[in-house]
């Protein structure tokens, strides 16, 4: 690290000479202090030029708050010493504030003019794309809109009766024409209601749209953020993992569509009075999703390729979806493994897409394994949930293997999936031969192969070991051919 700047008197000529020498020696992606390229460190870019530096390399006397920030979102502004000042300046946000404080009138005009000219910078680390992003628009938005238009007009709409009667054959996303007849019910809900019921200190994950990374906030902070005018919010944010089935005020009053209630595999196989080692059902059935306008969730697979029901209470949503074909899943895996993933718009590499626009009151159903991205034109509030089903057993297992190959963190996988598969095997054996007729041969083989993995630990309730359970299931399959499938 270079020697820190001292506090000795510096003349105007000295400042100009130093600025010229510094600009001459700069390279955009090399820290001017340590000359290194240590990408594991937090970086920040100068507002007035393309220069990046390591935050920890900035001299302490240049810090407005006297201490280094712990994360990039704490940084309000940075200006290097090559722009007519004796030393660099790193300004930090107030610790308890989510939006920038009002500036003095004489500076506010200059600041507003600058924002109109180039927009506020996003101080995400250099190794997350090496591009200067705008805080209020995700860089893939234009590509998303082009792809959305390309695949528009292909979406299908069904009635609630058709959804119920033809659920086993449903292989594409659909809008429900008459959601009021689907069985879906939700109480009156918004951010204020959530804060009142859960409490202002309730902790939740909030996604930063630009980085697609989560931060821990309180419900009170989120309510304050959503009640802040769009133009002064510090960043675009999303809440997509707030599960509320355990909250009596919501869990008991939110009713899922009948087609979901009738086909949820967990409800089908989970014991009414589970043993302590089995425990409670996975909490994935009832989520609240809240998004600020311009929020964007990049392409993803829902954990274990679960199917999704999605009821929009307020705002607007745009979905872009692609089926789980071998080619699309292969492109998805390659994209996940690419070091430049954040710079690549995956939609340009996928085929057979479909797009949907959702408005308040819409009920949307996504079948298993669809790769999708979501854009939010307006502040929105959604109730939805995930579910496994016998119809898609082999797809669920295929997606779980992709999650393993792409090293998805356990936090973002389906809770207790191995246990659900073990319980499914026991449930099938308890109802021979009729229950085997409910799944295809492909599903049965996929289930057996998955459970045979020696790394998978499962203790059956009615068999001495997992091996004896699987032997019984294999023998049953030999004498009872499962359904042939659609």
From Swiss-Prot:
Residue positions annotated to bind substrate are 297, 317
Alphabetic keyword roster: Chromatin regulator, Dioxygenase, Iron, Metal-binding, Nucleus, Oxidoreductase, Transcription, Transcription regulation, Zinc, Zinc-finger
In short, the EC number is 1.14.11.27
Q: How is the cofactor bound?
A: Binds 1 Fe(2+) ion per subunit.
Q: Which cofactor does it need?
A: Fe(2+)
Q: Which GO terms describe its cellular component?
A: nucleus
Give the PROSITE patterns listed for this entry.
Answer: JMJC (PS51184)
* Subcellular location(s) of the protein: Nucleus
Q: Where is the JmjC domain?
A: 245-404
Major site of localization recorded for this protein: nucleus
Q: Which PANTHER family match?
A: PHD/F-BOX CONTAINING PROTEIN
Entry protein name: JmjC domain-containing histone demethylation protein 1
User: From which organism does this entry originate?
Assistant: Eremothecium gossypii (strain ATCC 10895 / CBS 109.51 / FGSC 9923 / NRRL Y-1056)
Lineage per the UniProt record:
Eukaryota, Fungi, Dikarya, Ascomycota, Saccharomycotina
Gene coding for it: JHD1
């Amino acid at each position: 690290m270079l020697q820190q700047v001292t506090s000795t008197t510096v003349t105007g000529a000295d400042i100009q000479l130093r600025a010229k020498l510094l600009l001459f020696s700069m390279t955009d992606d090399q820290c001017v202090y340590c000359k290194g390229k240590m990408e594991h460190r937090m970086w920040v870019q100068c507002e007035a030029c393309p220069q990046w530096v390591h935050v920890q390399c900035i001299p302490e006397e240049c810090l407005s708050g006297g201490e280094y920030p712990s994360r990039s979102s704490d940084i309000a502004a940075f200006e290097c010493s090559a722009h007519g000042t004796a030393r660099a300046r790193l300004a930090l946000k107030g610790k308890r504030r989510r939006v920038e404080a009002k500036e003095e009138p004489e500076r506010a005009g200059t600041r507003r003019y600058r924002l109109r000219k180039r927009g506020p910078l996003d101080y995400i680390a250099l190794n997350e794309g090496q591009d200067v992003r705008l805080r209020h628009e995700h860089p893939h938005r234009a590509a998303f809109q082009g792809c959305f238009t390309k695949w528009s007009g292909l979406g299908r709409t069904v009635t609630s009766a058709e959804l119920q009667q033809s659920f086993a054959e449903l292989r594409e996303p659909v809008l429900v024409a008459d959601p009021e007849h689907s069985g879906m019910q939700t109480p009156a809900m918004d951010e204020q209601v959530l804060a009142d019921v859960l409490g202002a200190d309730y902790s939740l994950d909030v996604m930063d749209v630009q980085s697609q990374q989560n931060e821990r906030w309180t419900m009170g902070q989120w309510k304050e953020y959503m009640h802040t005018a769009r133009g002064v919010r510090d960043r675009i944010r999303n809440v997509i993992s707030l599960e509320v089935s355990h909250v009596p005020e919501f869990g008991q009053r939110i009713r899922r569509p009948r087609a979901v209630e009738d086909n949820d595999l967990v409800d089908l196989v989970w014991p009414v009075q589970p043993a302590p080692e089995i425990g409670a059902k996975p909490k994935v059935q009832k989520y609240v999703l809240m998004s600020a306008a311009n929020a964007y969730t990049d392409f993803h697979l829902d954990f274990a390729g679960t199917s999704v029901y999605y009821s929009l209470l307020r705002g607007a949503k745009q979905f872009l979806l692609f089926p789980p074909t071998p080619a699309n899943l292969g492109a998805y895996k390659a994209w996940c493994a690419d070091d430049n993933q954040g710079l690549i718009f995956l939609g340009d590499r996928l085929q057979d897409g479909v797009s949907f626009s959702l408005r308040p009151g819409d009920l949307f159903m996504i079948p298993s394994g669809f790769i999708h991205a979501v854009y939010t034109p307006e502040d929105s509030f959604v109730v939805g949930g995930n579910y496994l089903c016998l119809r898609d057993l082999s797809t669920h297992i295929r997606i779980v293997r992709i999650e393993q190959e792409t090293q998805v963190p356990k936090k973002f996988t389906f809770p207790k999936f191995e246990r659900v598969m073990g319980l499914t095997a026991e449930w099938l054996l308890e109802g021979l031969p009729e229950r085997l007729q409910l799944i295809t041969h492909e599903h049965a083989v996929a289930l057996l192969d998955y459970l045979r993995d020696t790394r998978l630990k499962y203790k059956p309730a009615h068999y001495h070991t997992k091996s004896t359970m699987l032997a019984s299931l294999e023998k049953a399959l030999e004498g009872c051919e499962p359904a042939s499938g659609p």
